[in-house]
Design a protein with these regions (language model features):
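Internal alpha-solenoid helical repeat scaffolds
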Residues: 1-158
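Helix-coil-helix junctions within alpha-helical repeat/solenoid scaffolds
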Residues: 7-15, 29, 123, 127-231
Length: 231
């Protein structure tokens, strides 16, 4: 549903450039960079193609983008960056390298939107490969990287990995499930709460605590919510 709006915004920017030839070259570059950034999201979830547009936008722009809110969600409702961008068996190392290379360009033009994504994806890759100690080290690095930067969607990805790691090794999570949910409720953002509840549902299902699965999932009420709805 959002693709037509994104294309409309891109066309408005291109029309503005065409209608105002007097624009300074620097501002023309900024507007063209915005167009590249918008186009990159239409390539989701192909990190190779998205990266091409991020690099192009980074080369053209001298200011942060105005088409992206740096405090908005980065993961499209997913609690896992790995689940978002791992597309093909055997390509994980390539995908991790592409994330490492492209994200600094993206951060530059979005004021750090999604900061820590490549770090938590690396941590998840270690986890999926059974390298639990390396996963824990990378997880703590991700937590440190996002501390105080407002990237709640990445923090939720960290929480989800911490939950899964706690099943496989003896680690201390930063908050109890109840404490973390209370913290999220204080932010008055139902998207974050729903994402967190989805990770709790997974954890309780895997550990056999089915009576603790949040009602949204345990009672099969997903059709009643929109995970991407603001607030």
């Amino acid at each position: 549903r959002r693709i037509p709006k994104m294309l409309e915004m891109k066309q408005l920017l291109l029309d503005s450039i065409a209608e105002h030839p007097e624009l300074p070259q620097e501002e023309r570059g900024n507007l063209l960079g915005e167009c590249d950034l918008i186009q990159s999201f239409l390539m989701y979830n192909d990190i190779s193609r998205m990266s091409q547009f991020h690099r192009s936008a980074s080369e053209k722009m001298t200011r942060p983008a105005i088409s992206i809110r740096s405090d908005g969600g980065w993961t499209f409702g997913s609690p896992s960056v790995l689940m978002m961008f791992h597309r093909k068996s055997g390509d994980l190392d390539k995908e991790l390298e592409e994330m490492n290379q492209c994200m600094p360009h993206y951060y530059k033009i979005t004021n750090g939107h999604g900061q820590g994504a490549e770090t938590i994806m690396s941590a998840e890759a270690h986890f999926m490969r059974g390298n639990f100690v390396d996963a824990h080290i990378a997880l703590e690095k991700a937590y440190t990287q996002i501390q105080g930067n407002g990237q709640e969607s990445i923090a939720l990805c960290c929480d989800f990995l911490a939950q899964r790691l706690s099943i496989c090794m003896d680690i201390k999570m930063r908050n109890t499930f109840e404490e973390r949910r209370k913290e999220l409720l204080q932010g008055h953002n139902t998207t974050w709460v729903n994402i967190f509840d989805s990770t709790c549902a997974y954890y309780y299902a895997v550990t056999g605590q089915t009576e603790r699965i949040p009602a949204l999932f345990g009672a099969h009420m997903l059709s009643t919510v929109n995970f991407l709805a603001p607030g």
